[in-house]
Amino acid sequence: GWGAAHILSKQGLGGKIPLSRLLADAIHYAEAGVPVTYSQSSLTAKKREELSPIPGFAKTFLVNGKAPTVGSIFKQERLAKTLRQIAEKGTNDYYRGDLAQLLAKELTDIGSPLRLDDLRRHRAKLIDPLELKHRLGKVYNMIPPTQGVVSLMIIGILDQLNLKRFKVDSAE
């Protein structure tokens, strides 16, 4: 879908930023790493036993078999390599190129029913998003099967409540 969005941006909206630039920050942070947050550390520790049998989980998310510590640097070199290849070869490589072949092989190796042909048949669809008219402007979100409807309902309800009349941290 991101490839179709990038093309739409360039052709229909006058977008000028190349894919390589759009992915540059993600590549940087995947390579250089980001500080591990409390929630990442605690949830990884909590779910470690359940998730460890999943192929690739321990190698990607654990440090010496344990959850990473808060403040340590979490790097994702394989993600950086994948994003760099997408930046160089285009998003189509993920579904129909070298990345697709690698992904299909790894999926087969772990017993997934997805095959290379499934990836090759994938096509993004352009759809009209959900829209909510808000007093501050329009808010957009995705159609089901996402939580888009619920999030727009919450925003709409909050818009009607006039929250400015409440004090911060009040019981109301």
Regions found by a protein language model. Give the residues of each.
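Feature marks proteins synthesized as precursors that undergo proteolytic processing into two chains
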Residues: 1-172
